[in-house]
Amino acid sequence: MMKRIAALLLTLAVALCAALPVFAAGTIEVTEDVSVSDDYDWTRFQGQNLTLNVYNWGEYISNGSDDSVDVVAAFEKLTGIKVNYTTFDSNESMYAKLKSGAANYDVVIPSDYMVAKMIAEGMLAPLDYSNIPNSQNID
C-alpha cells in the first residue's frame, strides 16, 4: 500500500491543481469558481465508489474558508471520487504514523528531505507517468 503513495501523490496534485481555473480553448465548468480543461476524461471513475485517502500539511489545499475555492469538493464533484482529507503538523509525526502502520493513505505529501528518507526506506514507489496525463508539462 505504501508503494502506491508516490504515484498517487503526483496524480492527485496534478488533478487538484487542474481543478483551479484554467485558460484553455475548451473548458468544463465545475462550479462558479472552478473550470478545467475538457481534454481529459474527468468522469471516467464516476459510479465506481472510489475513495482517495489524502494525508497533507494543513492549509495546503484550500477548503472554501475565507472565500477560497473548496478544491476537494470541486474534485469530488468533477470526478465522482470521494476524498478523505487528513492533515499533519510535522514531517516527523506523519512519518511515525505511516511507519507504525497505524494509517493507510493513498496520497501523502511530505517535504523534500522526508521524501528522500521515505524513498531510501522503500516506503514510496516510482511514479508511473503513463497514469499522469499532464506529466509532459512538469518541469
Stretches with model-predicted labels:
Residues 26-117:
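Early extracytoplasmic/lumenal segment of secretory-pathway proteins
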Residues 1-26:
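Gram-positive cell-envelope targeting signals
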Residues 7-8, 63-67, 94, 130-133, ...:
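A generic structural micro-environment signature
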Residues 39-43, 103-107, 125-139:
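A structural signal for short loop-to-beta-strand junctions that line the ligand-binding cleft
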